[in-house]
Amino acid sequence: MGFKMGIVGLPNVGKSTLFNALTRTAAAQAANFPFCTIEPNVGDVAVPDTRLPRLAGIAKSRQVIPARMTFVDIAGLVQGASRGEGLGNQFLANIRETDAIAHVLRCFEDGDVTHVDGHVDPIADAEVIETELMLSDLESIERRLQTITRKLRGGDKEAIQQERLLKLAQEMLEAGKPARLAEVADDDRKAWTMLQLLTTKPVLYVCNVEEGAAATGNAQSARVAEMAAAQGAAHVVISARIEEEIAQLDAEEAALFLDEMGLEEAGLDRLIRAGYDLLGLQTYFTVGPKEARAWTIPRGTRAPQAAGVIHGDFERGFIRAETIAYDDYVSLGGEAAAKDAGRMRVEGKGYEVKDGDVLHFLFNA
């Protein structure tokens, strides 16, 4: 099951530098001119989780396999993208294929790095991109409402639901609000997601600050934090320059560097976890002598569907899941001890998997 987060931003905000650090590569050409990223660069990154190596140590696992997320560095956007200006059409098509948006905002002053509008204002930058996404959605909604007219005449239930949801989104957008702020009933949630509107995607604001502000943020990132809180969005503070340096160091050197900078952990780790949380994801583990592995599932997933992430046969032939909570596994010293202590539970098809569960599935082949 793949989860994809698109990294977006105006030209020269540091998003390609950030992508390079995330993926530990120089894949994205981080040049000081608009549109240096034309084709989206795609990178698969490990989700940091201190629980996994602890489980592996207890089980003496020969291999450790973390959960992963996909990040996509998408072409720099400019005002007018919804009308096809700059690389607008390509940008909008690429972002439509992602599950969430990491919006990099320039919160640093640097005379050597040009700003597309000539001055630094992260709130205005955020509004530029949000406006372009909203305009694109409005255009898309108008087209779709026209195309479903015939189905509506025939009383098609799906078309009736789609029209209702499209009009709900249209009302939000015409009021100047992104569609993700609309109140959608649980019964409509799947159909709402299927609309694939750009402004329904959850947003994480990434405040790219100067190196000296990486630990505490600055006045510009504080403004972004207020904006995010008002929108019910998430935000992280990060220095792409620092992360780029850390990406070139080994683990020991990186730890020393972070300590010198007054940072408890790499900003990228916080960014990845924030993206994971934004997408409503959680982790369960399978642990044994061969491997300890983290598996990604949406929150609220039931045991058979969680098993299906490993293999479809596990879901189809699901019998039960032997379950140990992470804290019990660690405090008691492994599967056998947890079982002896009565801390291993047998869960059926209705069980909602919890974050950190250590699971062993039994199924009919």
Question: Would you name each region that the model predicts?
Answer:
Residues F35, A75, E109, D121, ...:
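General secondary-structure edge motif
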Residues G2-V8, V13, F19, T147-K354, ...:
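C-terminal-of-GTPase-core extension/linker across diverse P-loop GTPases
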Residues M1-T114, E130-E132, E142-R143, I148:
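Conserved G1/Walker A P-loop phosphate-binding module
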Residues T25, R51-L52, A75-V78, R106-D112, ...:
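Conserved nucleotide-binding/hydrolysis micro-motifs of P-loop NTPases
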Residues A26-P34, N41-G43, R51-R54, R83, ...:
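Glycine-rich, flexible loop/turn motifs
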Residues L22, G84-L87, V116-H119, N218-A222, ...:
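Short, glycine/charged-enriched secondary-structure capping and boundary segments
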Residues F35, D49-L52, I65-F71, E85-D99, ...:
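Amphipathic alpha-helical transducer elements in NTP-driven molecular machines
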Residues L77-G84, G118-L133, L152-E158, G212-A213, ...:
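Flexible beta-alpha connector loops of hexameric P-loop NTPases
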